[in-house]
Amino acid sequence: RRQTGSPPAGGARQPLPYEELAKLASSVVMLQVYDDQNQCYKTGSGVLINGSGYILTNFHVAAGGRYYGVLLEEETEVFYTDELIKYNQDLDLAILRMEKRRAPIPIYRGPEPLVRGQKVVAIGSPLGLFNTVSDGIISGFRTVGRRSMLQFTAPTSHGSSGGALLDLYGNLIGVITAGFDDGQNLNLAVDYQSILEFARGLL
C-alpha cells in the first residue's frame, strides 16, 4: 500500500525517499492527442486525481483533440478516450476520463504553506520520453492571468505539460504547464489551490 499524503494530526512528517516518490509515476500518464484524421499530432502528460479514471492535464494539451491515447506504466496497451469532462482555458486545466482505473495522487491541502526553496519532484514525459523523474526546488510564486503559478527548477521539456509537481510527501502541489527554452530550469506549474478550485466535486 502506498504511503502518500499528509500524516494524521500529531504524527511526525517524514519525507518519502526519492525511490518511493518515483513510484508515483504509475499514476502519471502520457497523453497522445489525435486529430480528425486519426493522426497523433502532439503529446503531453496527465495525472490521475481520483479512482474513477479522471486525468488532470493542461487545457493546451487537450485542446483540439478529437480523442486521446493514454499510456500507463506497466501496461503495453494504449487506452483510448474521447471524454473531455471539464476544462478552463483561463486556468489552463482540463480533465479527461478513461475506463482504466489506477490509484490517484492526492492533491495537497495544507495546512502548511508552500515556501520558496522547498524541494519538489517533477514527473512527466518530456519530448515523448515516458515518465521522466527529476527534482529541484520551488524558486518563486507567480500570478499569470487568473493562474497562481509555482516557479520551480526541476528540469522539464516539451511534453512535460500536464505532468505532476510533487512535494516530498507524495502530494500533488502543481500541474506542470510551461517551460522557457531560453531560461535554464525556469519552469511553471499551476498551483494546488487552482487545481482544487477547478476540480471541485470531482475528487
Question: Across the structure, where does each feature detected by a protein language model lie?
Answer:
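C-terminal subregion of chymotrypsin/trypsin-like serine protease catalytic domains
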Residues: 167-203
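Short, compositionally biased
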Residues: 133-145, 188-191
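N-terminal activation segment of mature serine protease catalytic domains
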Residues: 1-48, 54-59, 67, 198-202
